[in-house]
Amino acid sequence: RRWGSCTASGTLALNPDLIQAPVMCIRYVVLHELCHLVHHHHGKEFFALLGQVMPDWRRWKERLEKNG
């Protein structure tokens, strides 16, 4: 499922179903999309940045995937 997207100009779009998720899952999606403003891919650098801004991102990603 696609939870969010971010345009090159910085516009975020979030899946309306996300409102039912725990706030930390929402935070994960928003931070994930904002990291795409710096790295437009899912490479090593992208995940390093995501880990800096949200060290426990894997926990929230897994919870969202499991319960989303």
Regions found by a protein language model. Give the residues of each.
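Active-site-proximal or metal-binding-adjacent scaffold patches in catalytic folds
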Residues: 1-28, 37-68
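Walker B catalytic acidic pair
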Residues: 33
